[in-house]
Amino acid sequence: MHRPALLLRRVKVPDEVVRILNELHAGRRPILIVTAHLGNWELFAQWLVLRGYPVAAIVRRMSNPLIDQDVNAVRERLGGTVFREHEVSRIGAWLRAGGIVYLLMDQHIAAGSVRVDFLGRPAFTTPFVTMMHKRFGARVLPVVCVRHGTGWAVETSGEFIPEYTGDLRGDLQRNTERLNGILGAFIRRYPDQWLWLHNRWKDK
């Protein structure tokens, strides 16, 4: 995390991923990059920052304040921006300015969540991505950064396009479940690389 040149060499980002990313970001359009605690999720965010993309990560406060401080200090030292999950106005301003927001969606969320399928079981999940797409026109790109041999490779399912029917609650549920399905497919492909230590499917 402290040697940018080595990091750039070890992360393989296919030309197709770069092409999609640049097309979505053309004209400084905002992007939501959606991922999971799979492989090395921090690495691609750092790659983006080192390549000059305006990236901000949405993070939850860790239970250990010293680790929380150290991890976020590294993120910011490399040039990234960090938002706490409750800083909605700052996140919105970042998107309005054409920034990229990087978030992990495979975690239990109680407040404001929708209960949709995740890996075959109902799970409370944030509908944040669909809400930000609808409000700011942010493009959505699901990605993972997974281990291959001694390095890491970035994969994407391509741009995710939310669908709207006029039923806001139903749209939030359907689009969130679709995103869960995409992340779930990546997790099923690389189950040994999924890091999850708490009850993802607990009751609200």
Regions found by a protein language model. Name each.
Residues 16, 41-45, 61-63, 101-103, ...:
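Short hydrophobic/aromatic-rich motifs at helix boundaries and adjacent loops
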Residues 7-10, 35-36, 53-56, 93-96:
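Short acidic/polar alpha-helix capping motifs at helix-coil junctions
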